[in-house]
Amino acid sequence: MNNSLIVRQLGLQDYQEIWHKMQDFTDTRNAETQDEIWLVQHYPVFTQGQAGKPEHLLQRSEIPVVQSDRGGQITYHAPGQQVMYVLIDIKRHKNLNVRQLVTALEQTVVKTLAEYGIESYPKPDAPGVYVDGKKICSLGLRIRRGCSFHGLALNINMDLNPFHYINPCGYAGLEMCQLADFVNQDEADWDNVSAKLIKHFADLLGYNITTL
């Protein structure tokens, strides 16, 4: 297995632009293409997954709504949220299927939050990561030609109010939370969190990291 993982820090980006770049990367990659993680924040946007239903958008606003090709229902992205896109060739990994990749992503977040003294957990019937019943991390993937794209969105220090305009991930009344609810502002640091996410994901899947 090629165990190299390229990590790209992309900063603040338009959702649709990055989405189409993920599609292009996945469509043109071959057996020699190294796996990559893209770390990004997005301008405010609601995204509907393939299972998304219009009724889960409760209130229209100036925030755009984009129909995406990832799994899952509607969610919200905005600055202050760490989005980690996972572009990997699942076929390279022995005994790794889509469900196990989802589990690895959830455990990446659980282990990251544990470093801040936060006890979090996944739910078997609702992908993502939760703290005291509130959702702190959303997750949705797309698999094409045995390769993944899309990934996870971990709330760090953002305006959570627009989540009230939707049923997050299709669940009415689901409350959202973020890292800044549990630690001081200095600890809710973008670079610190992203470094921990990368480390734990790489450790779980046996990668060597190259940061670009």
Curated annotation (Swiss-Prot):
Enzyme class: transferase
Boundaries of every BPL/LPL catalytic domain copy: 31-209
Gene Ontology MF term list: lipoyl(octanoyl) transferase activity
GO CC terms of this entry: cytoplasm
Known catalytic reactions: octanoyl-[ACP] + L-lysyl-[protein] = N(6)-octanoyl-L-lysyl-[protein] + holo-[ACP] + H(+)
Site (described: Lowers pKa of active site Cys): 135
GO terms under biological process: protein modification process
UniProt record similarity statement: Belongs to the LipB family.
One Pfam family from the record: LplA-B_cat
EC number: 2.3.1.181
Protein's name according to its UniProt entry: Octanoyltransferase
HAMAP family hit by this protein: LipB
Stated role: Catalyzes the transfer of endogenously produced octanoic acid from octanoyl-acyl-carrier-protein onto the lipoyl domains of lipoate-dependent enzymes. Lipoyl-ACP can also act as a substrate although octanoyl-ACP is likely to be the physiological substrate.
Locations listed in the record: Cytoplasm
InterPro entries in the record: aa-tRNA-synth_II/BPL/LPL, BPL_LPL_catalytic, Octanoyltransferase, Octanoyltransferase_CS
Misc remark: In the reaction, the free carboxyl group of octanoic acid is attached via an amide linkage to the epsilon-amino group of a specific lysine residue of lipoyl domains of lipoate-dependent enzymes.
Keywords annotated in UniProt: Acyltransferase, Cytoplasm, Transferase
Binding site for substrate: 70-77, 138-140, 151-153
Pathway annotation: Protein modification; protein lipoylation via endogenous pathway; protein N(6)-(lipoyl)lysine from octanoyl-[acyl-carrier-protein]: step 1/2
